[in-house]
Each structure stands twice: as structure tokens, then as C-alpha cells.
Amino acid sequence: MELSRRICLVRLWLLLLSFLLGFSAGSAIDWREPEGKEVWDYVTVRKDAHMFWWLYYATNPCKNFSELPLVMWLQGGPGGSSTGFGNFEEIGPLDTQLKPRNTTWLQWASLLFVDNPVGTGFSYVNTTDAYAKDLDTVASDMMVLLKSFFDCHKEFQTVPFYIFSESYGGKMAAGISVELYKAVQQGTIKCNFSGVALGDSWISPVDSVLSWGPYLYSMSLLDNQGLAEVSDIAEQVLDAVNKGFYKEATQLWGKAEMIIEKNTDGVNFYNILTKSSPEKAMESSLEFLRSPLVRLCQRHVRHLQGDALSQLMNGPIKKKLKIIPEDISWGAQASYVFLSMEGDFMKPAIDVVDKLLAAGVNVTVYNGQLDLIVDTIGQESWVQKLKWPQLSKFNQLKWKALYTDPKSSETAAFVKSYENLAFYWILKAGHMVPSDQGEMALKMMKLVTKQE
């Protein structure tokens, strides 16, 4: 057993060495990958709408990729790039400095990164009318892409396929999963759809907004007056949502965040133990000052495409991929993606999750302890609104502590699971769980995909 383990480790180091030697000697970022380990392409999902995907085949030294699951990663925003942020900042084989990531998911799954909705990352549209404006369009576009992908890559049709997501990507993942389940049942898409994981997901926006005040107050980041102000604007958001005024609710959501920033001395919405970074020059423009929506875009999209990542994607990566149109820059259309979805932001998707549970689809909810924008209190709140018949039995269970190492005594997370619903409480993590707690995120992925 020990000899087998050592052989696996040696093979892993050889794979890693060959991966790194693929870089040219003259430039640490101009590399050539081993044949067959990566593929990428565009799919025209609608007229004037072109979606980009990038696949990494699993590199486990002891198993063939066909023995491991395929994981599709969906970023948030909307407008955040999976091929960029998800890949180089969270779970891909390399970081933005092109150094190996110790907690990459690639040893345990093949990874499919998709820039979605259209206009995100390297995906692009030819006309402004082609941007997606709602969840239905997002899901429909993804069905076109997935059909094309599985038709062209039949080697993955029988491999367990999971969708993992983050933030607004979770809302999109839920809608996509419902349509994918239908397509698989109807035989229009051939794949072994095995489950969806919703990470710090914007499933019920109003439950998140309503929980911000109590959460911040409990963490000593609001006083009584601040709590009253935040609670007041949260009630306005609730009223707008109840009346179906979703665009108005989005504007009020933006105002709520401004009130929180003022009262907390600039708390970071993605990790409450850090401060927000200084905002850039464009924020002083008249457009910015009069538009809460532009401010939302600044906060929730631009942090997903920092300078280092943008330079990497628009430089060495674009050169490597070779198929990106010359006039397309990574992330250039992200703001338009975000603004086009204005009417969809505050719509709840609890009923979508209920459909998945009723269909028997495995649903995992996971959340970072230090996240504010989608805090755990809000997640727990919408879960309790599910109409799933087994919810009472789920609630009766006691959670189980998880550790990243069997020898460790430090609790890394808690989990509760019953039938096809699981909930993970990830400790010491903010909104981007794999970035903050890479080892625990990897362990969770292995648990969800039944590898532990």
C-alpha cells in the first residue's frame, strides 16, 4: 500500500514537472501544454452570441480522466469569468503568477470553465440586443453549449457530471440544472448529470439583504443606529420584491450596500474581516454618483478582473488560445452583462431549487462563514422556505464536523446531509471559498462527487 502511494506521488511530480517544462525558457508565461490535456472552443448559442469554454482533463497520477468526474465551474457577477477568476484565482492548476496551485481540483476531476452569460470573459456578442436579460435565456444558452460539448466529446458522456458555482453563478447553476435534467430525460443531451453545488449563491436575494443588519450587528460591525438604518432599507427592498418591482429592488439593494459601507467604515462584502480596497477614479464621475446600479457593477464585477488577472488573460492566455478574435478583450463586455440582468437580480430562485430536489437531483449548498453579500444566515433562511417534503427530517439531523487532515484537531467546516440535500458551513472563508480555504474546498468537492 505504501509502495503504491509512493509510485503515485512520483508520477504526480513527473506530471507537474512536465507541465512546468511546457513553459518556454524565455518567458515564464508562454507555455505549450502536453498534447490532449486541454481543449477550448467557442459555441454560437444564438445569433450574435458566442460562448467560450475551456476544458482541462484530470491529471490524477493513479487514475485515467474517465474514472474521475467532470466539474463545470460557473462564476458570479453576473459578468465574472470562470476561465479567468475561477481558473487562475480559485481551482485551476495555476495561479495568476502561473505557479502550481496545491489545492487545484484538477487531480480529482476534469474541469470545464465556461464564460457565461454571453459577454463574460472571452465570450462576446456582436450586438447589444444579444446580451441575456434573464435566467431563462442564460439556461437556454447553456443548453446549446452543453449539447455541443457532449456531442463533440463523447468520452465525457458517461462520466459523472457536476455543476459547481459561486455567487450569482449559483442562481444560474440552479436554472441551468433544471433545464439540463429535462434535456437528459428527453435524450437531447447525453451526459451523466450527477448534481449541482450552490456556493454562497444568490438564490434568494431578499433573504440575504434582510440578514445583513443582524449579521453585522452580531459581529460588532453595526451599532443600534446603524442596524436601524440597514433594517429600514432592507424592508424597502422586501416591499419592492413582494410587489414584483424587481428593477426598483435592485436600485434599493445598491442603496443598502452604500448605507452599510457608511456605517461599517467600509466593510468588505466578500470577507468581513478585511477592508474594501480603495475605489478607482471612475467612481467620481457624475454617472457613478447618480447610479447605484453602476456602483453595484463596480463592486461585484470589477473585483473579479483585477489588473494582474486582466493582463494575464489579455496577454499570454489570449496568445496561447489563438482563437480569440483580435477585437475581443477579456472582460471588456462584463459591465454590459451585469447591467443587462438588472431586472433579474432580485428575483428569487427558491422554487427552482425545489424543482431540483423533487426531481431527485443532488443539491449541495455551501457557504463561507465570513461572507457578507450572501451570508450564511440568509442562506439558512431560504433553505427553510423550501417545500421539499424531507426538510423536517433534514432539520432534525445534527451537523458533523469536518477536518482537512485526519490528524488535525482544527474544525474546518460542518456538514448536514439528508437524501439529496446537503449543506456545508465553511469556517474562516468569505465569499470565495476556494480562494480563502482551498484545502477545505477541495475536500468538499471530493465529498460531493463521492470520492471520500
Swiss-Prot record:
<dbReference type="GO" id="GO:0006508">
    <property type="term" value="P:proteolysis"/>
</dbReference>
<comment type="similarity">
    <text>Belongs to the peptidase S10 family.</text>
</comment>
<keyword id="KW-0325">Glycoprotein</keyword>
<keyword id="KW-0378">Hydrolase</keyword>
<dbReference type="InterPro" id="IPR001563">
    <property type="entry name" value="Peptidase_S10"/>
</dbReference>
<dbReference type="InterPro" id="IPR018202">
    <property type="entry name" value="Ser_caboxypep_ser_AS"/>
</dbReference>
<feature type="glycosylation site" description="N-linked (GlcNAc...) asparagine">
    <location>
        <position position="192"/>
    </location>
</feature>
<protein>
    <recommendedName>
        <fullName>Retinoid-inducible serine carboxypeptidase</fullName>
        <ecNumber>3.4.16.-</ecNumber>
    </recommendedName>
</protein>
<feature type="glycosylation site" description="N-linked (GlcNAc...) asparagine">
    <location>
        <position position="362"/>
    </location>
</feature>
<dbReference type="GO" id="GO:0004185">
    <property type="term" value="F:serine-type carboxypeptidase activity"/>
</dbReference>
<keyword id="KW-0645">Protease</keyword>
<dbReference type="GO" id="GO:0097746">
    <property type="term" value="P:blood vessel diameter maintenance"/>
</dbReference>
<feature type="active site">
    <location>
        <position position="167"/>
    </location>
</feature>
<dbReference type="InterPro" id="IPR029058">
    <property type="entry name" value="AB_hydrolase_fold"/>
</dbReference>
<feature type="signal peptide">
    <location>
        <begin position="1"/>
        <end position="28"/>
    </location>
</feature>
<feature type="glycosylation site" description="N-linked (GlcNAc...) asparagine">
    <location>
        <position position="64"/>
    </location>
</feature>
<feature type="glycosylation site" description="N-linked (GlcNAc...) asparagine">
    <location>
        <position position="102"/>
    </location>
</feature>
<comment type="function">
    <text>May be involved in vascular wall and kidney homeostasis.</text>
</comment>
<dbReference type="Pfam" id="PF00450">
    <property type="entry name" value="Peptidase_S10"/>
</dbReference>
<feature type="active site">
    <location>
        <position position="431"/>
    </location>
</feature>
<feature type="glycosylation site" description="N-linked (GlcNAc...) asparagine">
    <location>
        <position position="126"/>
    </location>
</feature>
<feature type="active site">
    <location>
        <position position="371"/>
    </location>
</feature>
<dbReference type="GO" id="GO:0005576">
    <property type="term" value="C:extracellular region"/>
</dbReference>
<keyword id="KW-0121">Carboxypeptidase</keyword>
<dbReference type="GO" id="GO:0045776">
    <property type="term" value="P:negative regulation of blood pressure"/>
</dbReference>
<keyword id="KW-0964">Secreted</keyword>
<keyword id="KW-0732">Signal</keyword>
